[in-house]
Design a protein with these regions (language model features):
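Active-site-adjacent loops and short helices of periplasmic peptidoglycan-processing enzymes
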Residues: 1-144, 148, 153-154
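Extracytoplasmic
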Residues: 145, 150-178
Length: 178
């Protein structure tokens, strides 16, 4: 609602598993971190690592060795709900925050930042355990908190452009010179 005023709610504060709604925070945080760290997501690239090919659930079918811009990975995150893209983005951003090359550590750092942002945004009943939303004991939220997060996201032009895209095609670079 444009005024931000709550009109009607039903169990808005009931804590639930949120599955792929987690990717809304992942997308939000990647865009915000890139802005804060002065990174150009249209030019900055990430080489998909081997572990990403073993992602479960829905994926964007990213392939080890392919090179994507961060913008392309955001589309891969949001359009097909790509768990592989979520892991790649978390690895990239966690590496920026942590200056580490270990993907497991980078992803942990990113998830920790997701939870820090929850506090900053006033999402009192939200907690994340991973960047993609696959079942995890720590990943929970409420309809109210998700609505607050979505309202913040709708103020970001790139987020709006991504979620309103019906079809996205891109050219990828490979790192194996083929």
């Amino acid at each position: 609602y444009p005024s931000g005023q709550l009109i009607l709610s039903y169990r808005a504060k009931q804590s639930l598993e949120i599955a792929s709604l987690t990717k809304i925070m992942t997308c939000y945080l990647i865009i915000k971190l890139a802005e804060e760290l002065k990174r150009n997501i249209f030019d900055e690239t990430f080489d998909v690592k081997e572990y990403v090919e073993y992602s479960t659930g829905t994926t964007a079918e990213l392939i080890h060795g392919d090179c994507y811009t961060i913008e392309q990975l955001l589309y891969a995150l949001m359009l097909p709900s790509g768990n592989d893209a979520a892991m790649s983005l978390a690895d990239w951003a966690g590496g920026l925050l942590n200056a580490n090359s270990d993907h497991r550590e980078n992803i942990k750092v990113f998830v920790k930042e997701m939870n820090t942002r929850c506090k900053q945004l006033g999402l009192k009943d939200t907690r994340f355990g991973n960047p993609h939303g696959l079942p995890h004991k720590d990943t929970r939220s409420t309809a109210y908190d998700i609505s607050v997060l979505c309202t913040k996201c709708l103020d970001i032009p790139l987020f709006c452009r991504i979620i309103s895209t019906k079809e996205y095609r891109t050219t990828i670079k490979t790192t194996d010179n083929l």
